[in-house]
Amino acid sequence: MNPELSIVVPTYKRPEKLQRALASIGAAVSATHEVIVVDDCPQGSGFALASHHGARYMCKAGVDRGLSASRNIGIDLARGRWITFLDDDDFFAPQGLDRLLAHAQNERGIVFGDYSAFNTESRADIDLSYVNLNAMLVVNRIPVGAYIMERRGITQRFDTRLRSHEDWDFLLTHIENNPLHHVPGVVVLIDKTAIDSTSMLARRRKLAWLDHLSIWARFPASHLDAARSQLLLSLGIQLPAELLQFEDEI
């Protein structure tokens, strides 16, 4: 019998945080579930942890590297009615997934909850009850790990061409046919602890606003041009208004 929920966990050389992520799952969900760990590390450093926690394991090092490709492999391997994704440095809150699943029995679409953002000095709970399609068309508000959706409702994979925000693009792609439903309460804790960045990662972050433009081009919303311009200004980018009037040609 297939499980109720599939949980896809991409990982890369972070065994301590992967341990924390996998250990959180048992307290987050009591329904039947499977965990799929997709490892980008050539040494397969996540294998022992995946085995210890009873997870399915796939090592994909050297082929289609990156989060998008890992999540897509997880989608292909998943058997659950519902699916969610968890980054290896984040972890689920107790009963968080159970609350989403309980609500999902009566709703069709993307069911999401709130999240906590934390670092070594502080933690803040983020209420997402205000999130709707318009909010999502400006910037992603729902982090990976905070939502579940029906696996059969997935019509497109994560875009491996994007430098960043592939999770935002994935959600926008599916919101039209999978309405958003909010469930109060923290579902996932997002680790914002600063890490040492390589020059490549730093460059990707500096260019992340270009992915905003790519995504906005796919999802034109002229009534939100002002909000989108304001977001770019907050990133230190000022563009002529006409450059935000997109035709979807991607």
Give residue spans per PLM region:
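Active-site beta-to-alpha loop of glycosyltransferases that engages the nucleotide-sugar donor
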Residues: 9-20, 41
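Acidic donor-diphosphate engagement hotspot in glycosyltransferases and nucleotidyltransferases
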Residues: 17, 46, 71, 92-99, ...
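Short, acidic, metal-binding catalytic loop of nucleotide-sugar glycosyltransferases
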Residues: 23-32
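A conserved acidic beta->alpha catalytic loop
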Residues: 37-48, 87
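Glycine-rich, basic loop-to-helix element that forms the pyrophosphate-binding segment
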Residues: 61-78
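Short aromatic/hydrophobic "clamp" motif used to bind/position activated sugar donors
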Residues: 83
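Conserved donor NDP-sugar-binding/catalytic core segment of glycosyltransferases
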Residues: 97-125
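Conserved nucleotide-sugar donor-binding catalytic segment
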Residues: 130-212
